[in-house]
Amino acid sequence: MKKTTLISIAVIALMSVTSCCNASPENEAPQVKNVIYLIGDGMGFGAVTSLLLSEDNVTGFEQAPVIGLSETCSADNYVTDSAAGGTALATGTRTNNGFVGADPEGKQLTSILRKAQDKGMKTAIVVNTTLTEATPAAFYAGVTSRKMTYDIAKQFTESGVDLAIGGGFNHFYNRPDSLDLTATLIEKG
């Protein structure tokens, strides 16, 4: 009896594996053309629950084809700040609180934005805060303190981002080091 049961399980398992591997062109997922990565900075389960409970209709949030949630702790603290959280979202790497786009040793990490650029894709950063804020900066900069906003702005000018919409003009113009990064950006088009 045991031998028959084991053979039956093996046959079912083999059929399951081969049916999953029997992909044909019409069953393949379509090629992804564009990716829009929306981040609700600081938007935890409480905020999402409030949204869902406050609306009588189905929200756009609920209609999204893919939704991901992230629960993290930073490399040096149980509670993650937006610099370490943004870095984890941008690079997949845990880092120290306050670090932006850099690992715990201070080495700049490669973000998903840079990987998209390496594949020849156009990239953009659109924020309702400053472009040098920790979360968006984690996609193009690498610094050991989120307060290094002037350095972050300089790294933005070298980032190759095709479109940027956000605040923080004072980090690019009329700076303590007298650099006019707006002129640099205009030169680059």
Where are these regions (language model features)?
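C-terminal motif of bacterial Sec signal peptides marking the signal peptidase cleavage site
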Residues: 17-19
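Sec-dependent N-terminal signal peptides
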Residues: 6-14
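N-terminal catalytic scaffold of extracellular/periplasmic and nuclease hydrolases
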Residues: 22-189
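Positively charged n-region of N-terminal signal peptides that target proteins for export
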Residues: 1-4
